[in-house]
Swiss-Prot record:
The keyword Ribosomal protein applies. CDD domains: Ribosomal_S15p_S13e (cd00353). InterPro entries: Ribosomal_uS15 (IPR000589), Ribosomal_uS15_bac-type (IPR005290), uS15_NS1_RNA-bd_sf (IPR009068). Keywords: Ribonucleoprotein, Ribosomal protein, RNA-binding, rRNA-binding. Belongs to the universal ribosomal protein uS15 family. SMART domains: Ribosomal_S15. This is Small ribosomal subunit protein uS15. GO terms for biological process: translation. The keyword Ribonucleoprotein applies. SUPFAM superfamilies: S15/NS1 RNA-binding domain (SSF47060). GO terms for cellular component: cytosolic small ribosomal subunit.
Amino acid sequence: MLTVENKADIIKKYQKKEGDTGSTEVQIALLSARISDLQSHFDLNKKDHHSRRGLLKMVSRRRRLLEYFKRTNFEGYRQLIADLGLRR
């Protein structure tokens, strides 16, 4: 589960300016953290199909955001995927 402190740390790390919570980088980083938390949840709960659907929705949303970010800011995109450890 993503705690308030973890979420604040992620936002602080990827924000462009003070109070920035909705930029593409922040959204992608938060989704990546939630996705990794859910993946560890599925190691213990293999039959939790309702949460799996939510995971798939988050993955597709992150994929769309990454495609948009790649189109608009390619250098930032390359740095972000390297920083988050995503394979693309």
